[in-house]
């Protein structure tokens, strides 16, 4: 029998080269993005800054592992450790929201919503969600979205007098159109939602109630916003935004039978192998959200957004609905004659990042808009308090006032504000070891 010689393995640079060594172009772009996040004030309400631990989990070798199926029921071998990670994510999610069921595999909030639709509806069924211009989301029945193409999408809005949901109008609409599914929640509604009232309406017309709490999930987990779980048949959410985890989605329910349908809808219905490195990041973020300091964080998120709103109001600008109960606020620029797109650009030149956004009954196109959406999660994560958010509001007013006077923007004012922003952000560094 011949001797089998096994040569010593070569130490491959494939496993040792850094991204700077192997791909300078991508490394440079990442470096510049880190600098942008450090030097600019992030006010986009759907963005946040994750912990170093979440970054490490998401950049781990779990990205190598295929794991179609669910813990204990995989279609591949070698899943014992990713099973541990996914089970941790599931159990922590259930504990955070008081849920009996959780699916942490959706790759996004949109796919979580699609999973619910696939489980509960058939093409042509009627859904009732908040209209996009009133603060809803694309996936709640907007015409360009799958939800507006595959289903008969009806919508409810807000009162013109105070920009709040009119529950009597929602009830009347539900009775009129008889939806199979009612969707509560949105992407630009700053006030608390009465989930108990939505459930009453759903029961009256025999509809399922789905709550999309993508924007407020962290506030719910921290106890500063009403929990929809006791009222909804199903809740969907993203895992970033106020929950401060990696970008991804999740489905929650207290109905185990519906849970089986949601599992089948996500896999094999919509997705194949889950992103295990992202699920690891979710597990870490959920663990962070279970700590006592997370409640303090979300309490500050709300207080900071209210301080920002007050500073903007004191500067002569209108806040939709007169204020906020959450992490976001909408600035109505119509009284000043400004458009959302030009305001967004002027503020970004001053290193304040937010987004143009439609306001209720907005006459402008979605690419133009009459408003700005601002939010407090990211800057609160880096340590800003009420004093800093008040200053940020004052700086915003200064840039916007200059834009009223000079429609192309005032370069001198923007430069002065930019230097003030850089001085402020320098006091609150992020990822210093990555800079």
UniProtKB/Swiss-Prot annotation:
Any single biological process term in GO:
glycine biosynthetic process from serine
Cofactor(s) listed: pyridoxal 5'-phosphate
Q: Which PROSITE patterns match?
A: SHMT (PS00096)
Per its record, what are the GO molecular function terms?
glycine hydroxymethyltransferase activity; pyridoxal phosphate binding
Assembly, in brief, is:
Homodimer.
Mind telling me which HAMAP family this protein's record contains?
SHMT
From the Swiss-Prot or TrEMBL record, give the protein name.
Serine hydroxymethyltransferase
Q: Give the organism, scientific name.
A: Maricaulis maris (strain MCS10)
